[in-house]
């Protein structure tokens, strides 16, 4: 085992020989990170990426200036999908160490799950991993039901069944109930709904290779809301919350759904399929119908839903949509407290009508006349939320995954969004 490289923090500028505005310097004792008070957490995260790039795989965070947030910023930049890294953490008080340990356990689970190859993480495996994580932190306060394959069709989950039937791996709906009250009749405070497309080829509206090569990550929304519930539980969540994960592959086969097919949902809505690569909204619709039936105060869905959100925000922000201004403000306040990037994009009544079909009530994709793809996707989902104008948040997870490394992140999943949603649930 190599000796750990000591990493210390300083508010003093680096020696001028390291260059103007140098953020780190190296001496016989190790590496010093020079904080300037402007974006200290970002500076630490970027420095950790550079340290990893130097091939340093064993570090000791040394000194009294480290706290849980600074340690976490370092780990966010230091962690990568290849190789092993060891961090010797500084002495923290019990509360901060517990917070850090919970982040390491749960958000690393989210990142590792999203990074997993589709071959090893199908719909059933994703659902079971979610059950295992929540059960690990909640124990007997959790019950769940898994519905799969033809049982989905028999029970009316036509969106999920339609999308997933083209794969040999059956589609799966996970319905998980976290009920810390012990009262089976306790009201449901919140419902979380996640898109769990474990691989998205685009179906017959097939993706090009450059757009398909990262589609193992199309279950990022499901992983994010699962992690958020687990993390909220570790922070003392004492209200009943239900989790719905809509898990499927979107593949091409003789049994796959086709353009022009019409899906009839349990709420009576008929949807014409004009793009099989707009499948996420089709599976989420089933989860949102179930969520609405619980009459919760709050519904949050999360999905890697549209390329349009990435076009608007890149991979730097999650896109937020809501008709409820007060609730959107609460989510953004939670994001600010957790230092996670969210940005609200437009969602108006007219977006709900920008999905015209000649054969059904709705089309599953907008036309060239209505190019606001992220907003029309949110508008589509609103048709499956009973009281869509209040208590509903839609998160288009554009910051979930990076195809290439940048100065703050390795390639792969980020885990962003988990803490924000957990913060909102426990506020």
UniProtKB/Swiss-Prot annotation:
It is found in: Cytoplasm. Mn(2+) 1 binds at residues 200, 277, 279. SUPFAM superfamilies: Zn-dependent exopeptidases. Keywords: Aminopeptidase, Cytoplasm, Hydrolase, Manganese, Metal-binding, Protease. PROSITE patterns: CYTOSOL_AP. The keyword Plastid does not apply. Binds 2 manganese ions per subunit. It is an enzyme of class 3 (hydrolase). Its cofactor is Mn(2+). Its main location: cytoplasm. Its EC number is 3.4.11.23. GO terms for cellular component: cytoplasm. Transmembrane segments: none annotated. CDD domains: Peptidase_M17. InterPro entries: Leucine_aapep/pepB, M17_PepB-like_N, Pept_M17_PepB, Peptidase_M17_C. Gene3D superfamilies: Zn peptidases. It catalyses: Release of an N-terminal amino acid, Xaa, from a peptide or arylamide. Xaa is preferably Glu or Asp but may be other amino acids, including Leu, Met, His, Cys and Gln. Pfam families: DUF3663, Peptidase_M17. Homohexamer. Belongs to the peptidase M17 family. Probably plays an important role in intracellular peptide degradation. HAMAP family: Aminopeptidase_M17. This is Peptidase B. It comes from Escherichia coli O17:K52:H18 (strain UMN026 / ExPEC).
């Amino acid at each position: 085992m190599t000796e750990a490289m000591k990493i210390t923090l300083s508010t003093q500028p680096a020696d001028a020989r390291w260059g103007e505005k140098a953020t780190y310097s190296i001496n016989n004792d190790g590496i010093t990170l020079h904080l300037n008070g402007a974006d200290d957490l970002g500076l630490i995260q970027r420095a950790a990426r550079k340290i990893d790039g130097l091939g340093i795989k064993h570090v000791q965070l040394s000194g009294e200036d480290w706290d849980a947030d600074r340690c976490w910023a370092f780990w966010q930049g230091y962690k990568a999908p290849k190789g092993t890294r060891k961090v010797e953490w500084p002495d923290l008080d019990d509360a901060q160490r517990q917070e850090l340990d919970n982040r390491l356990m749960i958000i690393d689970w989210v990142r590792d799950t999203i990074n997993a190859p589709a071959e090893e993480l199908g719909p059933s495996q994703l659902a079971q991993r979610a059950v295992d994580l929540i059960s690990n932190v909640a124990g007997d306060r959790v019950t769940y039901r898994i519905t799969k394959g033809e049982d989905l069709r028999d029970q009316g989950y036509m969106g999920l069944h339609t999308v997933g039937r083209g794969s040999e791996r059956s589609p799966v709906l996970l319905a998980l109930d976290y009920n810390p009250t012990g009262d089976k009749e306790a009201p449901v405070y919140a419902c979380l709904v996640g898109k769990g497309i474990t691989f998205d080829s685009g179906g017959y509206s097939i993706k090009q290779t450059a757009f398909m090569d990262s589609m193992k990550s199309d279950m990022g929304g499901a992983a994010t809301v699962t992690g958020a519930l687990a993390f909220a539980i570790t922070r003392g969540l004492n209200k009943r919350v239900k989790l719905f994960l809509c898990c499927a592959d979107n593949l091409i086969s003789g049994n796959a759904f086709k353009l022009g097919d019409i899906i009839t949902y349990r709420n009576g809505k008929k949807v014409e399929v004009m793009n099989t690569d707009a499948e996420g909204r089709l599976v989420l619709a089933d989860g949102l119908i179930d969520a609405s039936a619980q009459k919760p105060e709050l519904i949050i869905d999360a999905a890697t839903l549209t390329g349009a959100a990435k076009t608007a925000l890149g991979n730097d922000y999650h896109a937020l949509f809501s008709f409820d201004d007060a609730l959107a403000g609460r989510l953004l306040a939670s994001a600010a407290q957790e230092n996670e990037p969210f940005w609200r994009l437009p969602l108006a009544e007219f977006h709900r009508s920008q999905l015209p079909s000649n054969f059904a009530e709705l089309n599953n994709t907008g036309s060239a006349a209505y190019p606001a793809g992220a907003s029309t996707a949110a508008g589509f989902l609103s048709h499956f939320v009973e009281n869509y104008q209040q208590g509903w948040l839609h998160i288009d997870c554009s910051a979930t995954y990076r195809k290439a490394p940048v100065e703050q992140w390795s390639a792969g999943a980020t885990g962003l969004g988990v803490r924000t949603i957990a913060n909102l649930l426990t506020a």
